[in-house]
């Protein structure tokens, strides 16, 4: 029987990626006089990929990647005013109020009544804490884990540290790469909850043939899937 339900935060409980994509569009407009938009976004994505190990996930690393890309594509000729605007973009992102996804609060409330409920999210500590506080959902969780990366080893450590048998744990989130595949590798159940738009750097194939993998169209479907899994364990 499942005893522990783990949930991702960004683009699982509240919108996140669309803010990044909106800012990317602003970035492209600011640099439109120097390089084609498509090429610029490719360069930004490459910078993000390189910088994850340096800065981790989140708005601060994204802002630094925009500045780095602006300097590269202009051969260090980008005006200081543009750099200032990019910094302002990052600051605006950090102030942006969150918006819960449809059914998020009701689903979290339902799950909290019957299971140990954990929030497992990756990203900047201060920003993730800010978003959780704004969401009003913190009161439903028995524990919160904000990590720099989501690997099978990280999930093993979280489960082990909390005395959780991974065979009785389920993780649900929008990222196959971070929320589903590593949890299955750690011995748990993984439920994919797609959200659009999605981040290219998290794209990977779904483990469709694995018996501990499920996919749903909305978070509100999760209690039903959990009931089905428990009924067949």
Where do the PLM segments sit?
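Asp-based, Mg2+/Mn2+-dependent phosphohydrolase catalytic module
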Residues: 1-2, 105, 109, 124-233
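Active-site neighborhood of HAD-like aspartate-dependent phosphohydrolases
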Residues: 1-43
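An amphipathic alpha-helix signature
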Residues: 20-28, 63, 67, 125
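Hydrophobic alpha-helical core bundles mediating ligand binding, dimerization, or RNAP-core interactions
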Residues: 23-28, 44, 48, 86-91, ...
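Short, surface-exposed acidic
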Residues: 32-47, 75-86, 140-143
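A metal-dependent, Asp-based hydrolase signature
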Residues: 47-92
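Substrate-recognition element of Asp-dependent hydrolases with the DxDx(T/V) motif
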Residues: 80-99, 104-135, 145-149
């Amino acid at each position: 029987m499942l005893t522990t339900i783990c949930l991702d935060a960004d683009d699982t409980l509240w919108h996140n990626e669309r803010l990044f994509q909106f800012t990317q569009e602003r970035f492209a407009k600011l640099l439109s006089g120097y390089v084609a938009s498509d090429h610029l976004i490719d360069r930004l994505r490459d910078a993000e990929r390189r910088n994850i190990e340096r800065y981790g996930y989140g708005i601060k690393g994204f802002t630094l990647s925009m500045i780095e890309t602006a300097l590269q594509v202009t051969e260090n000729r980008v005006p200081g005013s543009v750099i200032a605007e990019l910094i302002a973009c990052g600051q605006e992102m950090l102030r942006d109020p969150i918006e819960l996804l449809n059914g998020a609060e009701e689903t979290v409330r339902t799950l909290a009544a019957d299971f140990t409920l954990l929030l497992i999210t990756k990203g900047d500590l201060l920003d993730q804490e800010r978003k959780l506080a704004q969401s009003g959902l913190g009161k439903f969780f028995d524990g919160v884990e904000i990590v720099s990366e989501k690997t099978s080893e990280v999930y093993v450590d979280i489960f082990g540290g909390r005395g959780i048998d991974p065979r009785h744990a389920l993780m649900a989130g929008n990222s196959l790469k971070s929320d589903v595949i590593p949890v299955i590798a750690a011995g748990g159940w993984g439920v994919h909850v797609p959200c659009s738009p999605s981040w290219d750097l998290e794209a990977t194939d779904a483990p469709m043939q694995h018996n501990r993998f499920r996919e749903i169209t909305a978070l509100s479907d999760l209690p039903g899937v959990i009931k089905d899994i428990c009924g067949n364990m």
